[in-house]
C-alpha cells in the first residue's frame, strides 16, 4: 500500500506538499460546510477573546484535517502542537504536552481513536475545565493535585469516528465530517498548487488530474508532481491535456482514479465471487491486504463512486463495476450471477 500512487496516506515523497497547504480559511478550497462553520466559530471566539471550542475532524485520510488544524492555529494566533494517539504512550507524555501549552494554542491529536483509555481520561478535565489532575504518592498516602491549564483548543482527527468512546466524543464542541472533494474543487487545488510550484498548466489538464485523484487533495498534489516530471522530460515542461493523460496512464491511474489494487478488489468480487456478496475477511485474505486497510483506505472511495455496495451479507459489486470491466451482469432464475463478455 505504501507504494501506491493513489494512497490517501502521507508518504515520504509528500513532504514538498507542506509548502502547498493554505494557511488561511480564505485560501482553503472545498469542505464548504466545515469551512463556513469554522469561519463563524473562529470569529465569535476572537470577538469574545476566548479560545476556540474543541474540534473533532473525522473522515477518510488525505482530506485536509491537518491543514485545517494549521489554519485554526493561524487564525487564533496560537502555536500548533502535533502528536498522535499511538505516540502518547504514558500519562506523563500527555501531561508534558498539556503543561507546555499557552493560551490560544492548538493541540492536534491525529488518530485520536487510538488513545489508551487511561490516557483518554486525563483529557476529560483538560477539555472541560482546563485542568490537569495529578496523583502524587501511592496507596493511602496518595493525594490528587489539580493544575490549571491555559485556554487551549484540542483538535482531534480520526478515520474511525465509531471507535471513539462517547465520553470523549461528547466533549468536543464541534464535530466536522470531512467529505470527498468534487472534480471541480480538485481542479482548483491543482491550479493553485501548480502556480506555487511555478508550473504552467491548462485548466483541462488540471481537471484531468483532479478527476483521477479519488476526491483527495493529497493525491491530486502527488499526481501533479509526477505529471510535472513527465512533462519536463517528454514535453517542454508545460502541462497540457495530452501530457497529463499520457503521464497518468503511465502511472496506471485510470479515468476513474482506480489503480491496480482497486481493480483487483473489483475483479475478485465479480469474477471470483460471482459479484458477491462476499465477506470482508474473505476478500481481504483473497487479495492479500489487511482487513482494516480495505475498510479504511479502499472501500470509502469505491463505495462513494458506486462500484461496490455494503450489505448485511457482505460486499456486492454494482452494475457500474461490471461496466468498468466491459461485462454485463445477468440474474438467472436461481439468483446466481453469470458474467457474459459483451
Swiss-Prot record:
The UniProt record lists the EC number as 3.6.4.-
Signal sequence bounds: none
Q: Where is this region: Small ATPAse domain (RuvB-S)?
A: 182-252
Q: What GO CC annotations are associated with the protein?
A: cytoplasm; Holliday junction resolvase complex
Q: List the residue ranges forming a coiled coil, or say none.
A: none
- Name the principal localization, coarsely classed: cytoplasm
- Give the matching InterPro entries: AAA+_ATPase, AAA_lid_4, DNA_helicase_Holl-junc_RuvB, P-loop_NTPase, RuvB-like_N, RuvB_C, WH-like_DNA-bd_sf, WH_DNA-bd_sf
Positions of DNA binding:
310, 315
Protein name in the entry: Holliday junction branch migration complex subunit RuvB
Species per Swiss-Prot/TrEMBL record: Clostridium botulinum (strain Loch Maree / Type A3)
Q: Which gene encodes it?
A: ruvB
Amino acid at each position: 500500500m505504501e507504494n501506491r500512487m493513489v494512497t490517501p496516506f502521507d508518504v515520504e515523497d509528500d513532504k514538498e506538499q507542506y509548502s502547498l497547504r493554505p494557511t488561511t480559511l480564505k485560501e482553503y478550497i472545498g469542505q464548504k460546510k466545515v469551512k463556513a462553520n469554522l469561519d463563524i466559530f473562529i470569529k465569535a471566539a476572537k470577538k469574545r477573546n476566548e479560545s476556540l471550542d474543541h474540534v473533532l475532524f473525522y473522515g477518510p485520510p488525505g482530506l485536509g484535517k491537518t491543514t485545517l488544524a494549521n489554519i485554526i492555529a493561524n487564525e487564533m494566533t496560537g502555536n500548533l502542537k502535533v502528536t498522535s494517539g499511538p505516540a502518547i504512550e504514558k500519562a506523563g507524555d500527555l501531561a508534558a504536552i498539556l503543561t507546555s501549552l499557552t493560551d490560544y494554542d492548538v493541540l492536534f491529536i491525529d488518530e485520536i481513536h487510538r488513545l489508551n483509555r487511561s490516557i483518554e481520561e486525563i483529557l476529560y478535565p483538560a477539555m472541560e475545565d482546563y485542568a490537569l489532575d495529578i496523583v502524587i504518592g501511592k496507596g493511602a498516602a496518595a493525594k490528587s493535585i489539580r493544575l490549571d491549564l491555559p485556554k487551549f483548543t484540542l483538535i482531534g482527527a480520526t478515520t474511525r469516528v465509531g471507535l471513539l468512546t462517547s465520553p470523549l466524543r461528547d466533549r468536543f464542541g464541534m464535530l466536522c465530517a470531512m467529505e470527498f472533494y468534487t472534480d471541480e474543487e480538485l481542479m482548483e487545488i491543482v491550479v493553485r498548487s501548480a502556480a506555487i510550484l511555478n508550473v504552467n498548466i491548462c485548466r483541462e489538464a488540471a481537471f484531468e488530474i483532479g478527476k483521477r485523484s479519488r476526491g483527495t487533495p493529497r493525491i491530486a498534489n502527488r499526481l501533479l508532481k509526477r505529471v510535472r516530471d513527465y512533462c519536463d522530460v517528454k514535453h517542454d515542461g508545460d502541462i497540457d491535456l495530452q501530457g497529463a493523460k499520457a503521464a497518468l496512464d503511465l502511472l496506471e491511474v485510470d479515468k476513474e482514479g482506480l489503480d491496480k489494487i482497486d481493480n483487483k478488489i473489483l475483479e475478485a468480487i465479480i469474477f471470483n465471487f460471482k459479484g458477491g456478496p462476499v465477506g470482508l475477511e474473505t476478500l481481504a485474505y483473497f487479495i492479500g491486504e489487511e482487513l482494516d486497510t480495505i475498510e479504511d483506505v479502499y472501500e470509502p472511495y469505491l463505495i462513494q463512486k458506486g462500484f461496490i455496495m455494503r450489505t448485511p451479507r457482505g460486499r456486492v459489486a454494482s452494475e457500474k463495476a461490471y461496466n468498468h470491466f466491459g461485462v454485463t451482469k445477468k440474474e438467472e432464475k436461481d439468483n446466481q450471477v453469470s458474467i457474459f463478455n459483451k
